[in-house]
Every structure is written in C-alpha cells, then in structure tokens.
Amino acid sequence: NNSYYVFIGLSNPTGAPTLAGYGRTSDWNTSDKTPAPTDSFSYRAHSGDTMMFGKKISSANIRRIIRRVDWTSGSRYEIYRDDYSASNQSPLTKANRLYDANYYVLNSDFKVYVCIDNGSTGDNVLGNISQDEPTFTDLEPSKAGNSGDGYVWKYLFTVSPSDIIKFDSTEYITVPNNWSTSTDSQIRLVRENGNSDTNLNQLKHVYIENAGTGYANGLGQEVDILGDGSGAKARVDVVNGKITDVTVSAGGKGYTYGIVDLGTLNSNVSATGRAKLIPIIPPGLGHGSDVYSELGTDKVIIYARFDDSTKDFPIDTKFAQVGVVKNPTKVCLLYTSPSPRDS
C-alpha cells in the first residue's frame, strides 16, 4: 500500500544560526515575499533538501472537491447538458465543457443540487433568474418554490458538519468519500435511485432549441421520444402553432440519444417551420449514480494540522514550502555535529 504525507519546509532564518534556518542565508520573512517554486526538474529533484516535517494523510483528512457555486437569489444558473463543447458553449460562462459551467449550486444549508431546467430556450438562451432557493431532499427533480422562475433542481448530497468544520472553503465544495459504497442513508438513497433499473439513463428534460411554426395547437399533447432507449414520452404545449413547453411525462430508460417524435402534430408544418427539441441525456446511469463523474471531481483537498502537541515542532517559525510526498523513506535518524577537523 502507498503512503502519502503532507510536508512543510523552507523555514525562514531569523538571522541567528538557529536549527530551523541553519545553513541558509535567505531571509524572505523580512521582505514578506515567500520564495516561489520553480517549474523545473532540478527544483523537483532538490525539493527534499528543505523538507523538515511531515504528517501522514488518512482517508479522514482528504476529500474530492468541486468549484464552489453558491445559490444566490436573483442569479442565473446553467442547466446540466451532456453536449457542451467548443462549438456549443454554455450560455453564461461560455464553458467548452460541462465541468466549467455553473450547472450546480450549494445552498445555505450546504446541500448540493444540479440544475435540470432554468426556463431557457432557443429564444431565451440565458434562462431565467433563480428566485426560489432549493432546500428539499426529494429523490426526483423538483421546483424549489412557487415563484414560477422555471427552475427544476435535482438534490445530490449534503456536506456533513464535520467536513464543513475541517474543509470549509470559499472556493471549493467537498464531495463525500466512497460514494459507490457509502452506507450513509441519504447517500445510499440518492445513489440507488440513480442506479436503479427504473432510472437507467432516464430522461428528465427536453430543451426547446427552436419552437417551430405551424404545429397543431393544444396543451399536454403526448408524443414519443425515440432513440436507443425505450419508453420515454413528453407532453407538448402548442400555442398559435409554436411549441411553448415540453415536459417529460415518462423518462423511459437506456437512452444515450433521443429524438422527439412530433409526427402527430406536424401535418401543416413547412420545411422551414420545423421545431428542434433536444432531449438532455443524463450522466452515466442517471443523476446521482456517480457524483464524481457527474460533478467532475478532478481535485482533492487535504487537511493537516501541525502543532506543538508532540513538543518537536516549532510553532513560532514560518515555512514557505508545503507539498505532498509519496512513500517517503528514512535516510538518517540522527544528526551528527561536524568535527572541527572536517573541511
């Protein structure tokens, strides 16, 4: 098994030949300029020269993290889409990939939600402003209130109180460890709901890219969603020949692509009046089945506390070097004072 340690080093000399700064002449504390690391093989090879103390990292002191996106009333958020790219950037952040878009939020109770719908269409690409803070823990996507802001959210998890205390950051959100095997009741419910045969690649949202013209007027007209899955249906509202709303009435299962079949509604639609409806494909098996891939947890945060509880760590010294080392080995255990005759 591999072992990892947080280390600190490059202590600041005080001018006197103290043990902490022995053999070095730089005095970065007086200039208040911490020496910057150098991106070179030489720097990496010699980074161990100034390491002084280390602390072993346990699973309790490391978490996956994602960018922190706080829910704020009056702000806009982007919807989860499986097809953000350089040619189809997210509308608000202009992200070339999903993980750089603001498609999830952290609420005031440290609950995390994915945005399934924000009222956006091809005629309203930025979507609506969010007015209702999501607070529910329902397994199915839901609206957060009665303002009519058009937002639909999917609850994923709640940051635990212990993680808030240990890892709280203004820049990042911690994600629970061991998602696929966790026995936490709330995590298990969300995970199993996403993993269930019923929710296997189940569709939750259809985006109206183009409302079209000439369609048969009517509210709640049910149509099939075709593709490599089965069983999905949608209810379509048409007013004055234009599609104004599409709601998934049956999510089906097994979809990696989908096409809304408007054949029963388009008898009077011209070639230039055809609508474009895009079923949004969920992540993996379904929302919540694997939050690491759904949220893009490509970073970790590590907690390590150095104090004088063992009486061998100088708490009155500043350090300019911090890092992580894998499988360190002991090269010596004793310090021997050089002989006066040594040259």
Task: Mark where each language-model region is.
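Conserved, function-critical positions that sit in or immediately flank catalytic
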Residues: 149-337, 341-343
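Tryptophan-rich substrate-binding surfaces of secreted polymer-degrading and adhesive proteins
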Residues: 1-198, 274-276, 286
